[in-house]
């Protein structure tokens, strides 16, 4: 609705010819417009449209110059231009401008004058009668705009001549009296000086005998003999030779009377006759007015040096090029402003620290549908080695706040709600959180991995082992502060570098506490299945459904399995009472699980751990080198694979789980029965694993030495 009108082909040229900063008409630009319009078939229509737009300008100079351009087009562009000027659109624009009370009086008079000229020009063509109708309406609505008709040039009668002669005689008589009055005071002044020197008594009566005669003003005459100046009230254009042209406001010097209503005068070096009804008579200035005018003129001439200095400064400043005239300078100024803005914005928002990125393998298409819209994978977060603390018992409250607030998409479920599982970064997330495949039997033999933290979007975590393990991605809601995220086991064919050093971490309890093992807040809620297992690979459901397909783990380890090694001294960390706070998944509601070996879930929903003896701190587990962690891709029809399947426990030979009687916890602490005993890989209970001679096997322990805990799911 407020869209600006499209620019016409003549807008630029007409705008240049009617520039408001011009002091007079630019006839070169006007004649160029006339030539273009005369050679263009659509020129009259397009040019009149541009003229209508310029008439709407609020500057009086623009309006006057536009009328001059229209008059020049009417005289140089033929009948087609006459038809466009007599159109309803152009005449309505003229009437609207003339009837506007804010329009300057001079513009209104010029409109009336041009419409009268065009009416006289178009009167021979009946098709152009719209201009005459518009002129008649304007003259009726504004009678004061039209100047009076010039009087007839009638010769002076004898009576007129006698009246003029009488006025001339009276003026001469008054002039002589004024001269005599000026001479008498001049003669009396020299006579008063000698009489004052001889006797002051005679000077008083002589002065009293000459009363002061009042100065009588000269009566204003009505003839050319007594009137010396007149001021023009209207513009007058001569129609015959010998007439004097003048504009409104010009002061004309009267010379003589030629006709009854026409006088002869002089203006700007030109002499001619002019009608009396176009001017008003001016009274002659009094001596005081003449003296005041002379004083003002002297003041102006006294500042002639300053005037010359000002003219010099103006002429010197105009010669220098302006910045906006130079295109290169304008571009440089704009570029400098952009640079300063960018510099200021970069200083106000400094960039965050940059860390190494995870090495990503080429993704192999595997099994999960696209992720849902409400779950996102938080990027990894930087954590130093000193912050990988072993969590305290579940009954102690967490004293560390989460490293980052949970996203807005997550909601804390109630005790009976079913939360969504968490997934490894780089893997696709299932579209529905209830469609969770069970884990494979290979996941039962897993090495302890670093805990999962809530990650911040702009930071990366570099573990202390020198290698970057695959980050764990969660899409579940945060549980209460006292719960921990379940341990996520690797599944790759090569072992990643652990954040706990070259050996297992020595703990203060008789069992191995997973850094992310949760404490179930709901007694009736079972432990969740693995997020990366297919439905036919869940060790919990598979054991309950088909005991014949999954053999139980032997109670006696093979003789080829070495004893567990002691952890590195620099990575041994005691279990303090202030554990770190991690980003946890709420424990889901699921059927309680009973292990094939008889270890089941208690009434509290936690897992029973096999009692073990103390760890052997004198052996060290071998570590492979040259491994790079990568998030596992998923295949649409196959199981999920993880880079952690390359652990020695995946490559090692057969081994058996540790089982047996319980042992007291280290440091005198009672054993914690809520964890499941560690089930080593390569045993007969885990079918499908590689043979024992493919690589080093995970350390297994007899019944008294099994302090490793298996994967929670």
Swiss-Prot record:
Membrane-protein topology: Peripheral membrane protein
Domain SH3: 225-284
Stretches with biased composition (Gly residues): 653-665
Major site of localization recorded for this protein: membrane
Signal peptide: none
Keyword Membrane in annotation: yes
Domain VHS, first and last residues per copy: 17-146
Bias type Polar residues, positions: 471-512
Cellular location(s): Endosome membrane
SUPFAM superfamilies: ENTH/VHS domain (SSF48464), SH3-domain (SSF50044)
GO cellular component, one term: ESCRT-0 complex
Compositional bias of kind Low complexity: 186-195, 202-213, 442-457, 514-524, 680-704
SMART domains reported in the protein's UniProt record: SH3, VHS
Domain UIM: 163-182
GO molecular function ontology, one term from the record: ubiquitin binding
Stated name of the protein: Class E vacuolar protein-sorting machinery protein HSE1
Annotated source species: Chaetomium globosum (strain ATCC 6205 / CBS 148.51 / DSM 1962 / NBRC 6347 / NRRL 1970)
């Amino acid at each position: 609705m407020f869209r600006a009108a499209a620019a016409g082909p003549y807008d630029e040229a007409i705008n240049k010819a009617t520039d408001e900063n011009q002091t007079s008409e630019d006839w070169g630009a006007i004649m160029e417009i006339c030539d273009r319009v005369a050679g263009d078939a659509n020129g009259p229509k397009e040019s009149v449209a541009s003229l209508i737009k310029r008439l709407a300008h609020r500057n009086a100079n623009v309006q006057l110059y536009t009328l001059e351009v229209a008059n020049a087009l009417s005289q140089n562009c033929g009948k087609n231009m006459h038809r466009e000027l007599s159109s309803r659109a152009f005449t309505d624009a003229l009437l609207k401008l003339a009837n506007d009370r804010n329009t300057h009086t001079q513009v209104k008079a010029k409109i009336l004058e041009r419409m009268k000229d065009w009416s006289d020009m178009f009167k021979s063509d009946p098709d152009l009668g719209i201009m005459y109708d518009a002129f008649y309406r304007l003259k009726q609505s504004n009678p004061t705009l039209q100047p009076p008709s010039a009087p007839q040039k009638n010769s002076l009668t004898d009576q007129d001549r006698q009246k003029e002669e009488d006025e001339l005689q009276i003026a001469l008589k008054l002039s002589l009296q004024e001269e005599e009055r000026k001479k008498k005071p001049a003669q009396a002044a020299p006579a008063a000086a000698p009489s004052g020197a001889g006797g002051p008594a005679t000077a008083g009566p002589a002065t009293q005998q000459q009363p002061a005669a009042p100065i009588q003003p000269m009566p204003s005459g009505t003839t050319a003999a007594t009137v010396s100046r007149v001021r023009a009230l209207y513009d007058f254009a001569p129609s015959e030779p010998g007439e004097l042209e003048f504009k409104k406001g010009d002061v004309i010097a009267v010379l003589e009377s030629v006709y009854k209503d026409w006088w002869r005068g002089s203006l700007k070096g030109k002499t001619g006759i002019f009608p009396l009804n176009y001017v008003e008579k001016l009274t002659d200035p009094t001596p005081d007015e003449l003296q005041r005018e002379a004083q003002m003129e002297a003041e102006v001439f006294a500042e002639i040096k300053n005037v010359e200095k000002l003219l010099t400064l103006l002429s010197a400043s105009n010669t220098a090029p302006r910045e906006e005239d130079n295109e290169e300078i304008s571009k440089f100024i704009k570029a400098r402003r952009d640079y300063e803005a960018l510099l200021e914005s970069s200083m106000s928002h400094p960039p965050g620290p940059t860390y190494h990125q995870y090495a990503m393998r080429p993704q192999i298409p595997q099994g999960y549908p696209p992720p849902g819209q409400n779950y996102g994978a938080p990027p990894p977060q930087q954590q130093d080695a000193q912050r990988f603390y072993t969590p305290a018992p579940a009954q102690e409250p967490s004293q560390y706040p989460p490293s980052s607030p949970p996203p807005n998409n997550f909601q804390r479920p109630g005790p009976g709600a079913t939360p969504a599982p968490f997934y490894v970064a780089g893997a696709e997330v299932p579209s529905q959180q209830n469609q969770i495949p069970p884990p494979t039997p290979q996941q039962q033999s897993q090495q302890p991995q670093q805990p999962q933290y809530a990650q911040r979007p702009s930071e990366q975590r570099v573990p202390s082992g020198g290698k970057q393990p695959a980050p764990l991605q969660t899409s579940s809601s945060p549980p209460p502060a006292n719960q921990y995220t379940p341990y996520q086991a690797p599944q790759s064919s090569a072992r990643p570098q652990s954040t706990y050093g070259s050996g297992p971490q020595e703990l203060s309890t008789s069992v191995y506490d997973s850094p992310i093992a949760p404490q179930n807040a709901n007694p009736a809620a079972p432990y969740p299945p693995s997020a990366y297992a297919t439905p036919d690979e869940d060790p919990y459901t598979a054991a309950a459904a088909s005991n014949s397909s999954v053999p139980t783990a032997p109670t006696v380890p093979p003789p080829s399995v070495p004893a567990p090694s002691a952890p590195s001294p620099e990575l041994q960390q005691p279990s303090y009472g202030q554990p770190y706070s991690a980003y946890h998944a709420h424990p889901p509601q699921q059927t309680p699980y009973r292990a094939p070996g008889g270890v089941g879930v208690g009434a509290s929903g936690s897992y029973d751990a096999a009692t073990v003896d103390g760890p052997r701190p004198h052996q060290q587990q071998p570590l492979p080198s040259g491994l790079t962690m990568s998030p596992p891709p998923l295949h649409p029809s196959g199981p999920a694979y993880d880079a952690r399947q390359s652990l020695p426990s995946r490559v090692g030979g057969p081994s058996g789980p540790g089982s047996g009687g319980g042992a007291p916890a280290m440091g005198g602490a009672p054993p914690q029965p809520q964890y499941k005993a560690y089930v080593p890989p390569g045993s007969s209970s885990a079918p499908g694993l590689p043979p024992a001679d493919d690589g080093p096997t995970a350390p297994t322990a007899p019944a008294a030495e099994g302090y490793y805990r298996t994967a929670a799911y």
